[in-house]
Amino acid sequence: MVVVLAALMLWNEPNNLSHWNFALDPEWRGFAAMTCAAAARVRAVRPELPLVLGGISPIDVGFIRLLASYGVLAAVDRVAVHGFPLDWNHWPLADWPRKIAEIEQVANLPVWVSEAGASSFGADEIQLFGLRATARLLRGRVERLYWYSLLDLPPQWEATTRHRESEGSAYYRHYYMGLIRADGTPKPACAEFPRELGICQWFHFEDPRLEAAVDWLQRLGVQHVRTGLSWADWYRPGAEAWFDRQMQALRPFQVTLTLCYTPTALGVEPHYASPPRPEGQAEFARFAAWAAQRYAPVAPALGSLRALEPVR
């Protein structure tokens, strides 16, 4: 099955304990080896498919410099960053352009913002302000800008974070990042969402919200969608059927597909954020090549990286 893949993103937030337990890989050598191996396998089967380094959070110049020293940046076409200055980061919203410039200077690659957002935890008006200001600061500045997210997290679900204790009450901001409330009603920011921005929306295994999410994306006129497939889910019964269903539903959009989450059987420790053992690194590379072959055309509809135009 072929989907219009705009890019393949290798991992998510590799410098954040919620997604990569760097206490088990303190110099990120395991991450570098895994990413380079996956990039090589994807290049072998889909050489034209743009590869993006998983969005970093926090935005850390030193981390990008470290990965460059391992050859990771030579293996990808773009780097990505995440920022939530109104909710968790320790820098002001107005610093977005400076943050982008700092990473560009070190990476010598274009920078995507693969997650930017603001919660409605305190008030809907705060989220609306964050959307307006983020769009004003970054439209025309970056090739891709994905708003996180479309849907609020259902209150009965757990947020994907290992920082609950340190976050305190800020943990609950994770539940209010969407343009659409958990009950299906739109927030004020939804009515003003600029259709030229992308949206990042993650889906859980057999997520019942998939069809409603696609309906909202189409109503908003969104063209660019970032989502993910869980490597950990690849080994579950019915995984390929679910992956196919998810990707089939997203066919109307240009998709940046993120691959992330370690199967417990392949981790240094049995946790989705664990670095994989050496044999697991090869398995992730195999998963990445499988996803590229299954969901990307031989020559992507974007044609080449030259076709990637900044959002306006």
Language model features by range: what are they?
Residues 26, 123-129, 133, 140-142, ...:
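Aromatic-rich peripheral "rim/lid" segments of glycoside hydrolase catalytic domains that contact
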Residues 1, 60-70, 128-135, 204-219, ...:
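Short, acidic/polar
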Residues 8, 31, 35, 60, ...:
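A structural signal for well-ordered alpha-helical scaffolds and beta->alpha junctions
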Residues 15-18, 56-65, 84-96, 119-125, ...:
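Acidic-and-aromatic substrate-binding clefts and catalytic sites of carbohydrate-active enzymes
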Residues 4, 47, 75, 141, ...:
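Residues that flank catalytic or metal-binding motifs in active/ligand-binding sites
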Residues 3-6, 12, 54-55, 62-101, ...:
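Aromatic- and acid-rich polysaccharide-binding/catalytic face
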Residues 37-45, 66-71, 75, 102-106, ...:
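Alpha-helical structural signal in soluble globular domains
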Residues 1-59, 216-312:
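Substrate-binding cleft and catalytic face of glycoside hydrolase catalytic domains
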